[in-house]
């Protein structure tokens, strides 16, 4: 039998309770574990409903406050998920653990069933993926997937559809592989999804991805400022791994086919554009200006400084972002306020550029642009690593980080699209 875990903070109580009831009623589930960040209103609501849910389903509903497992980073999502892993590993009668965000309005029993069916085929990890708005998942596309393309282009990492997704199933083998790794236990913040995904592949686990056609309907953020901490922590997690090697041709990766995207998803805007436009004009310091001038492409530096005076985003195209990403991998310093704000501003510029150039042309055009960016970046990085391998003694497993300083120093010829240089 399986355990289903819902990590939570303060959420819509009715949604959380409904999801707990749904999971508890599933025939493959024996225990529902609710891991709370704190004992607030949501905790009290689950506690009040627990007796009736247990009585009606015959299943155990466990409430557990997340423990401080990582000690060097901010306590957040990572501590919550790792608290659940520790509980699962201590209860050997449980064979699989599912994770689902507690605020998902569209959650249903089918999510559990689809994951269980793939695990029955001896996959160690089953991840859920969804149709997403063309302006949603901007950290996934521009931070995680690009990082995987640049650093490990010949592995399956660039091709995992939603590597930051919090909806997944782990077998006991996979849970042990993750929790016994000190890097996982130390990643107490938003970077935990990056670590889970990376280590699953590094350790050769067998991975399946199942498609949820109705999408993940949950609370959206208002402006991109709300995502600043997540952005910094996800990028920092990627940077911490840049010298790691990943064996090639180990493990398997299978994906379920997609379905037509619902119109509601196609029409949704993932963030407040008007609020976001103001972000490039605020919180500037001389330190940020100095870092920008010292380390980055002059075209990007000029464009971002112009954006501090008036709305402009044409400078932050795909080439500019990839070049900036390489520089950030080498020089970014987590905890330095100027570096963190500069990372945020460059990323905001990229998101606005994508929105105005591609999303306004329609959903299909926007998704095609995102997928093309990943495909081209992966291919170019793979060719670069192939060239480097011919002159390097490491021939099995690699990290591309040794090429970063050289590439970061190369200046590209800027091709400005006049239509988007507003």
UniProtKB/Swiss-Prot annotation:
Cleaved signal peptide residues: none
Keyword entries, A-Z? Glycosyltransferase, Transferase
Q: How does activity depend on pH?
A: Optimum pH is 8.0.
UniProt EC number: 2.4.1.269
Q: Please give the catalytic activity noted in the UniProt record.
A: (R)-glycerate + GDP-alpha-D-mannose = (2R)-2-O-(alpha-D-mannosyl)-glycerate + GDP + H(+); GDP-alpha-D-glucose + (R)-glycerate = (2R)-2-O-(alpha-D-glucopyranosyl)-glycerate + GDP + H(+)
Q: Where does GDP-alpha-D-mannose bind?
A: 7-11, 66, 77, 101-102, 164, 193, 221
Q: Which GO terms describe its biological process?
A: mannosylglycerate biosynthetic process
Q: Specify whether Transferase is a keyword of the entry.
A: yes
The record ties this protein, via Pfam families, to: MGS_C, MGS_GT
Activity control note: Activity is not dependent on divalent cations, but it is enhanced by Mg(2+).
Temperature and thermostability: Optimum temperature is 50 degrees Celsius.
- MF-aspect GO terms: mannosylglycerate synthase activity
Gene3D superfamilies noted in UniProt: Spore Coat Polysaccharide Biosynthesis Protein SpsA, Chain A
Enzyme group, top EC level?
transferase
Residues recorded as binding (R)-glycerate, renumbered to this chain, are: 132, 137-140
The UniProt function text for this chain reads: Involved in the biosynthesis of the compatible solute alpha-D-mannosyl-glycerate (MG). Catalyzes the condensation of GDP-alpha-D-mannose (GDP-Man) with D-glycerate to produce alpha-D-mannosyl-glycerate. Can also use GDP-alpha-D-glucose (GDP-Glc) as sugar donor to produce alpha-D-glucopyranosyl-glycerate (GG).
Similarity comment text for this entry = Belongs to the glycosyltransferase 78 family.
Record's protein name: Mannosylglycerate synthase
Which organism does this sequence originate in? Selaginella moellendorffii (Spikemoss)
Q: What is the lineage of its organism?
A: Eukaryota, Viridiplantae, Streptophyta, Embryophyta, Tracheophyta
User: What would be the name of the gene that encodes this protein?
Assistant: MGS
